[in-house]
């Protein structure tokens, strides 16, 4: 008898089948990882916006209705994460504000937050039910 070294075709096929089964189990668990990461970024931006708005209110006794990356009178100095689009809606007074934020990588839509029970703007995020708590669908 000769002493052969290596794997038989059957052994290789069994390994391929086992790897295929493991991949079929693992892929659905990781399929929406990117969407979860984008959602976390959206919620983080809304939480940071709420903190920045409260700081702006402490300085000027009104909430900001616009934002930018440079210092400007009456404008909140704030920037959002890459590819996020933020819209602040609210009166420039002490009654409150609302904001929605979206990202093309987040299929369910936009996230929102509002502050103030007498909010006079027209864009109060419908998904937000608790004041100051950012919500995503």
Describe the residue ranges of each PLM region.
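Periplasmic/extracellular, small/polar-rich flexible segments of pilin-like filament-forming proteins
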Residues: 51-137
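N-terminal single-pass transmembrane signal-anchor helix
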Residues: 1-34
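Alpha-helix termini
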Residues: 19, 33-36, 58, 74
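Compositionally biased non-globular segments, especially hydrophobic aliphatic-rich helices
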Residues: 11, 40-43, 129-132
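Aliphatic-rich helix starts adjacent to a transmembrane/signal segment
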Residues: 29-46
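Conserved catalytic core of two-component sensor histidine kinases
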Residues: 16, 43, 50
């Amino acid at each position: 008898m000769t002493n052969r070294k290596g794997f038989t075709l059957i052994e290789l096929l069994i390994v391929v089948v086992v790897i295929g089964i493991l991949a079929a189990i693992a892929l659905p668990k990781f399929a929406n990882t990117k969407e979860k990461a984008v959602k976390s970024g959206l919620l983080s931006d809304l939480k940071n916006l709420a903190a920045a708005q409260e700081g702006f209110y402490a300085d000027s006794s009104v909430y900001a209705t616009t934002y930018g990356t440079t210092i400007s009178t009456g404008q909140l100095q704030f920037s959002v994460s890459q590819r996020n689009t933020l819209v602040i809606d609210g009166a420039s007074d002490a009654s409150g504000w609302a904001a929605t934020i979206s990202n093309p990588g987040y299929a369910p839509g936009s996230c929102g937050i509002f502050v103030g029970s007498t909010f006079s703007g027209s864009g109060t995020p419908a998904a937000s039910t608790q004041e100051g708590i950012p919500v995503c669908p």
